[in-house]
Amino acid sequence: MTRISAPDHTPNRLGIVGATGWLGQGLGLNLLQKGLWRASELVILNRSGQMAGYADHPGVILARDMDEVQALCETIVLSVRPEDFPLPGFAPGNRLLISFMAAVPMARLAELAPLARIVRAMPNGGATSGTSYTPWLAGALDAGDV
């Protein structure tokens, strides 16, 4: 586990909020295990503050809070329960947000994050094995987002 004390923004860093839940962990661990993402470019946040499941991937950054995720990452995956949203400190600016949250429509995300580029993705249980069929819907994206 790595902690960063001062903001060190890197465009390639991916933040996963809810990174130890089944969808967030499915994404994070599959990206790492398949070599699609470097551990040093993955920032995770969860309620417990634990690295459950990520111990075999030194360099993964465990964020303290949403402010730290936003300071470190250009792209943020929201994989939390709808009742836990919005999170304290949620102010993503113009970052790319990918929401896995059930029952939180894009309109609500756009209301809370008017500058963000928003993608609503709906992975299923196959996410834990890297075999999820994941339909998605996007608002306005930049060419670099795709």
Task: Report the location of each language-model feature.
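A short, basic/flexible loop-to-alpha-helix module at the beginning of a structural domain
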Residues: 1-9
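Short, acidic, metal-binding catalytic loop of nucleotide-sugar glycosyltransferases
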Residues: 35
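Structured catalytic/translocation cores of nucleotide/phosphate-coupled proteins
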Residues: 9-10, 71
